[in-house]
């Protein structure tokens, strides 16, 4: 929850690509120190599996956070939490698309409910906006980021068997390298990253807690429980995130949030049923 809250609080101060870039640049040396004892043993696996590592790095490290932070320029943190809550449904759907995983009638019903809830939030409960394709661009950016995270989660099953710290260190490094040209373009055409007390504090929080701690825990959860069950963390995030957005950012919960969230959570519940 702290990732989107911090990014929303800083989006009037620091451009989105710069925030993502410096978040990872601060995290990299810390990760390398943590992973150093394991990297020499995993180096061969890194060389042999560079293609899948680039794919995972792009969709999680580069694309997901950039799209999320870009979207938060135009929409609320509450919307971002509720749209992100639909990740388990995209994980199930993409598992079918890429790996031919089966889906039963109950899971199909769950996907329908979650989709209705997500669309309800994006169109703010107004059917006219849906018919006119009048969407908040910020919500669409975040939806794109949500799909990127689902792709990352699904393809984690193809990642090489290596120490979690080594895996995170190499994917963060690759992701930051991919992000570098976009950061340079942002400096030239949008604005440079200002280095102030609040930006430094925000970047440190994102680098340590939202990057290192959160990613290590999530990747480990996927390794142990599988992508579908690990994605169930989305039950908790929209509720805790909404509370934090109200308390820390002064955001308001609207009727379309109240309608959309139960639909998404019900969709996650039915979508996780194997039978």
Region locations from a protein language model:
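Small-residue-rich packing faces within the transmembrane alpha-helices of Major Facilitator Superfamily
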Residues: 1, 25-29, 115, 150, ...
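Helix-helix packing/entry segments at the starts of transmembrane helices
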Residues: 20-22, 65, 79-86, 155-177, ...
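Glycine-/small-residue-enriched transmembrane alpha-helix faces in small-molecule transporters
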Residues: 1-21, 58, 129-158, 177
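Transmembrane alpha-helices of multi-pass small-molecule transport proteins
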Residues: 12-63, 88-93, 148-152, 169-188, ...
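Hydrophobic transmembrane alpha-helices of multi-pass small-molecule transport proteins
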Residues: 31, 94, 103-125, 179, ...
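Membrane-interface helix termini and inter-helical loops of multi-pass transporters
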Residues: 5-13, 43, 73, 122-135, ...
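Specific transmembrane alpha-helical segments of multi-pass solute transporters/efflux pumps
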Residues: 1-6, 32-84, 120, 207-225
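Hydrophobic/aromatic residues within transmembrane alpha-helices
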Residues: 10, 19, 23, 71, ...
């Amino acid at each position: 929850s702290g990732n989107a809250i911090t990014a929303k609080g800083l989006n009037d101060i620091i451009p989105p690509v710069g925030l993502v870039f410096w978040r990872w640049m601060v995290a990299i040396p810390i990760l390398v120190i943590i992973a150093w004892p394991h990297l020499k043993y995993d180096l061969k696996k890194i060389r042999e599996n560079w293609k899948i590592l680039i794919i995972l790095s792009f969709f999680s490290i580069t694309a997901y956070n950039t799209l999320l932070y870009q979207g938060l320029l135009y929409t609320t943190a509450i919307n971002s939490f509720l749209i992100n809550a639909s990740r388990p449904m995209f994980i199930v759907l993409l598992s079918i698309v890429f790996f031919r995983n089966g889906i039963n009638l109950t899971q199909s019903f769950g996907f329908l409910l979650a989709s209705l809830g997500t669309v309800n939030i994006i169109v703010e409960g107004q059917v006219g906006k849906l018919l006119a394709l009048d969407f908040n661009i910020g919500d669409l950016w975040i939806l794109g980021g949500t799909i990127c995270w689902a792709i990352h989660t699904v393809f984690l099953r193809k990642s090489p068997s290596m120490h979690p710290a080594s895996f995170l260190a190499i994917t963060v490094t690759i992701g930051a390298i991919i992000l570098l040209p976009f950061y340079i373009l942002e400096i030239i055409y949008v604005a440079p990253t200002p280095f102030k007390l609040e930006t430094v504090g925000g970047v440190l929080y994102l680098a340590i807690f939202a990057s290192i701690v959160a990613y290590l825990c999530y990747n480990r959860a996927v390794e142990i429980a599988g992508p579908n069950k690990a994605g169930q963390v989305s039950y908790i995030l929209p509720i805790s995130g909404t509370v934090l957005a109200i308390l820390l950012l002064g955001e308001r919960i609207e009727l379309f949030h109240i309608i959309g969230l139960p639909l998404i959570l019900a969709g996650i519940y039915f979508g996780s049923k194997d039978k």
